Structure formats: C-alpha cells, structure tokens
Amino acid sequence: MGFYILYVCASENDRLQQLDFIILGGGASGLQLAHRLCKSDAYKASSILILESDQHKANDRTWCFWETGEGEWDDLLQNQWSKVQFKSQSIDKTIDLGDTSYKMLRSKSYYDLLHKNIAQNKSVQIKYERCTGFSDKGNHVIVNTEQNTYQCSTLFNSIFDWNILRQQQQYPVLQQHFLGWYIKTPTPVFDVQKAVFMDFTVPQKQETRFMYVLPFTKTDALIEYTLFSEKLLDKSEYESAIRDYLKEKN
C-alpha cells in the first residue's frame, strides 16, 4: 500500500535534533512502515518522526487486497469475498478464488490500531505539520515543514508528487479515478460471496470504464464507477453513470 522514496545518509551532530528516521505521510504506507520498524529488534529503539498534514483522518477510504488464508488484519475486515466476476458484452466469467480471498478493510479501524501500537513505543513521534520540502546534504537530510525544520539520517517519503509525472514526456499519464455509493435495495439481490470486480457493460466512450460492486449483505453494497483515463470527470458524470447502471439492473 503506497510507495517509498529512500534516502540513506550518515549521522551528523548539529544544532537540530538528530533523528534516525523521518516518515513523510501518516497514511497506510507511512503507518505500516513505522509499525514494522517498531516491531523489528534492529530498529525498535530508533528515533522516528512521522509528519502528517491531516490530524483528522477517519473513514476517508477503503482498502482491498488479495490474501491466501488467514492474515494479520483479519480482525479489522469489513468483508471478504471468495469469488470474483468479470463481465463484458461478450464474456461473463465468475472465478472461485479457492484458498485466496479478496479482503476489504475501512481506514479508520486500520488507523486506530496502528496509532495504538505505535504509541506504545516512546521513541516514535507523530506531528501534524505540512512538509514544504527536503534536501539531501550528503551526510544527513533536512526536512522543512510550515512550522519547523528537522534533521534525519534516513528519510522515507510517501507523499505523491504529480510534478514528477507531468514533467516527463516519454509516457502518457492515465489516472485511475472513481466515485462510489453505498446502496441498499428493498429486496435481496446480491451474492455476498461474490465481488463484481469489473463489469465492462457500461459505455466505454473510447476509454476504459467499468463498474465495481462489493456486496456486504444481500441488500447492501458499495458500487463504484471506475475509469482509467487522462482526465477526471465532473462529479455529476460519475453519479449519472451509477444511476443508469442501477436502472438497467432494476
């Protein structure tokens, strides 16, 4: 979940507090990294600072992933599915995943657990400050925020920078974007064991477009209209597509 850019430098005494690790971003990847460092015998005594701009992260997203058998996050799962369906105008295929499941967890339960675990390690700090930049000084890294300046030996950056993609001309840049609704039907219609992974029966409009349906009960589901394209749509376009899809399915 997420990605890291790593800078490894030697330590240096300076007027700034010297930290072993700074992690930019306290979302899924940043918290996961801090959690793993805290559990490691080699790094659990290291000084770690997590810099996160948003102090009020809640149920701001869901994460789904494939896993075989039982997993570390099973107690946090909102649901899991043992079958997935792929559908187009010419194909309708449902795959039994066997020992593998497609699992879903909500971000709040994940954030809460990892914050609790990380808080048990007194060498870890979380500060809610927006990073404005960082620079590699050869034997340390300087990190600037809107409030302070920090120094570390190793910096992990999980903050996505659009400029890196925009500045390159070698490859076209396609975005994966979507809008989802939680829906409830008056009568049972969903197979709770089956996730509709990609339903390409919606109009493609010379792009890659599909519906993604995750049922929680026979009457409750998350439905998302998903695209791979260069530009985002207006909110009304996503919602109109979902309405049309629901009308078609009665």
Name these PLM-found stretches.
Residues 97-116, 229-237:
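Short beta-strand to alpha-helix junction loop
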Residues 1-21:
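Extreme N-terminal leader/targeting segments of oxidoreductases
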Residues 35, 39, 116, 215:
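Short, well-ordered alpha-helices that flank and scaffold nucleotide-derived cofactor binding pockets
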Residues 125-246:
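Predominantly flavin-linked oxidoreductase catalytic cores and closely associated redox partners
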Residues 49-90:
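N-terminal FAD cofactor-binding segment of flavoenzymes
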